[in-house]
A protein has these predicted regions:
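Conserved P-loop NTPase motor cores
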Residues: 2-111
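Generic alpha-helical secondary structure signal
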Residues: 8, 14-15, 109, 119-123, ...
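Short C-terminal domain-edge/linker segments immediately following a structured domain
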Residues: 66-71, 97-102, 118-124, 160-166
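P-loop/Walker A phosphate-binding loop and immediately adjacent motor/lid segment at beta-alpha junctions
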Residues: 99-138
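Conserved P-loop NTPase motor module
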Residues: 124-178
Length: 178
């Protein structure tokens, strides 16, 4: 918080309303560019219909970029997910979360199997991620921002995914030690 002038540790709709009002004071060409970072703000108290949802559908008009992180993919509302233009997918340890992500974004490359190829190719090292550039049509799939893996259903990379560890699952008969 000390490194940034306008950093908050909570969210209210009023904050977004004030940001929009401050941008509306400018002509479009004079608006300052703004980045809003929302780090895991999605909780049971975060309504799916709020000013963030509105802003995510209109952010281009206000010269704002929005970076939203979450650990629960579907807790992000449909309007926000549908308006996402750049998606970063880190390694998922929860197979159900990965299934939701795969279901949502596999249509950008034509099949769930190809999506999983892109996903596995992107996670070649710790802390790596699959980057989807959804502003392009067809979408472009990258390892980090460095290696183009494919354009839509056209795989560019000649690599084959290595055997990757399966997402972590707790055995049904698991009992934690006390």
């Amino acid at each position: 918080k000390d490194a940034f002038d306008d950093c908050e540790d909570h969210y209210t709709d009023k904050m977004i309303q004030e940001l929009i009002a401050s941008q509306k004071k400018y002509e479009r060409e004079d608006m300052p560019t703004m980045l809003i970072l929302l780090d895991d703000i999605l909780s049971r108290d975060f309504k799916k219909t709020n000013d963030i949802t509105y802003l995510c559908s209109k952010f281009r008009h206000y010269e704002m970029s929005i970076f939203l992180t979450t650990q629960s993919f579907r807790s992000v509302g449909t309007i926000i997910r549908n308006n996402a233009t750049n998606i970063l997918i880190f390694r998922q340890n929860n197979s159900k979360e990965l299934d939701k992500i795969k279901e949502e974004y596999s249509e950008l490359c034509g099949s769930e199997a190809l999506f999983m190829d892109y996903y596995n190719l992107a996670h070649d090292s710790p802390h790596s991620f699959l980057y989807i550039d959804g502003q392009e049509n067809p979408a472009r799939f990258y390892r980090r921002h460095e290696v183009l893996l494919g354009i839509g259903d056209k795989k560019i990379s000649t690599e084959t995914p290595r055997d990757k560890p399966k997402p972590f699952k707790i055995a049904k008969d698991f009992t934690p030690e006390k």
